[in-house]
Amino acid sequence: MTGSLQSAARSYLRGLGDESTVVLCGGTALLIVSRYQGSADFFRAVFSPKLAGHPAIDALPYFWWFGTSVIFYVVLSLALSAATRGSFTRSYGLRLGDFRAGAAIAAALLVATAAAIYIASRTHTFSNHYPLARHGAYTLRFGDKQAVSRGLFALYEAGYFLYFLAWEFLFRGWMLNGLLPRFGRGAIAIQMVPFALMHLGKPELEALGSIIAGIALGILALRTRSFWYGAFLHGALAVFMDLLVAWRYLFPHVPSP
């Protein structure tokens, strides 16, 4: 009985031993570990007590999150492919691909989506959620005093943009291209699932919209053979949302756009 079960298990496992299995299992593990050790909450629990007097103490957990995301989503994903002799020697969408089509499509989507971002930024649901660091994204603390810092905000948004480059590489670069040989265009739908689930906790409309966004960004990456255009689009829209919400604090004497 035990022998037959072992034989059946080996038979099933042999069919799972390709790169798509490494991408699905490894990608899931990377997302889980990053959610714990790479989160802002982890930084607050481990490091914040030791850095309590730092002027940017409210922003530091997010710099940790953005930085560790690059390690988990880019460095470790490629290391995993290398260790398992996957297709790490391929581009994984790292090349520019079809630049003309990518730039045109990304620009059109940027203009079309920016209007929705603008409207959303005027609602309490989104203005109370972004920036993710809230006032910490642009506020320095000096004892009992606080000061708005545009420089801190610029650094925060640069890190935030870098986070989206890593995020897009994981889903539309590494995962999509790793699944493509086995699942064909179905890989677009498969990579959308964990992408959408990672939006749990965000405003409901954004979480639901991530289903459409995940499919659209997957198509864009497949059409252009590059993840860069979706990464720029995703990052630019996220920074735009933060800027709209934080504008009145950063530029109190300048009318809000």
Locations of regions flagged by a protein language model:
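Juxtamembrane helix-loop-helix connectors linking adjacent transmembrane helices
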Residues: 42-63, 83-163, 181, 251-257
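Membrane-embedded alpha-helical segments of multi-pass membrane proteins
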Residues: 67-75, 154, 158, 170, ...
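N-terminal, membrane-interfacial amphipathic/helix-forming hydrophobic leader that caps
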Residues: 1-93, 244-257
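Membrane-interface helix/loop boundary segments of multi-pass membrane proteins
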Residues: 166-190, 219-226
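Aromatic-anchored segments of alpha-helical transmembrane domains
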Residues: 27-37, 51, 111-119, 192-200, ...
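Alpha-helical transmembrane segments of multi-pass integral membrane proteins
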Residues: 30, 64-69, 77, 109, ...
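Functionally important transmembrane alpha-helices
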Residues: 189-192, 198, 204-257
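Hydrophobic alpha-helical transmembrane segments
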Residues: 21-25, 63, 67, 102-107, ...
